[in-house]
Amino acid sequence: MEKDFLGDILSVRGEFGYWVFEGDTVPAQRPSWNYRKEDDGGIIIDMLCHWRYVLDNLFGNVKSVSCLGATHIPERVDEHGKRYKATTDDAAYATFQLENGIIAHFNSSWCVRVRRDDLLTVQVDGTRASAVAGFRKCYTQHYGNTPKPVWNPDIDQPIDFFEGWSEVPEQEEFDNAFKAQWELFLKHLYTDEPFPWNLKEGAKGVQ
């Protein structure tokens, strides 16, 4: 984005989540409090704060947000084998309007089966190119490689839409993200380097 590879950014689409087992036939891989409102659970409070700083720092300040939360699995089994009622959201469908006009939409769910490159993928569509990034890999499609599909549901799709994407080559090794964050904070403490990620920035995520 710094080199304007994508052109004018039009939209950002995020898909996050995976199937968290209910706990009866297969043990759940997330703690039961995640699904109880009385224990401060819920995917909205868990994930939307992350989407906020991703959008603010990469694409533009969030101007407004609308979010629909849902409790798709009404009952689960806890760590002790006891059934309990899910009292908070296990999926969230959020649309963000940024100050610069970019529209972002993020689906977050613990009730979805993964058919994408990673547990989180973010697609950025621009006038010159598009990019799809996961945690470790990124794929791009330039304007010149963009296929021209024609709507015809009566025949098999002749275009392999994955074929026109190219993986971005690794040009550097990235250290552990939490380690990098701690290093920035320690530099701020001992050398007074700027550190914009303060309590106010954290509070923005739960406004």
Where are these regions (language model features)?
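Juxtamembrane/interface motifs at transmembrane-helix termini
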Residues: 29, 125-126, 153-154
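Residues within well-formed alpha-helices
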Residues: 13, 93, 201-204
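Predominantly a Rossmann-like dinucleotide-binding segment in NAD(P)-dependent oxidoreductases
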Residues: 1-85
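Contiguous beta-strand/loop segments that form the cofactor/metal-binding neighborhood of enzyme cores
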Residues: 5, 52-145, 179-195
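Tryptophan-centered motif/residue detector
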Residues: 33, 110, 164-166
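C-terminal helical cap and adjacent loop that interface with cofactors, partners, or active-site loops
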Residues: 122, 132, 151-207
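Mobile, glycine-enriched helix-loop/loop "lid" segments at the mouths of ligand-binding/catalytic clefts
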Residues: 13-26, 137-162
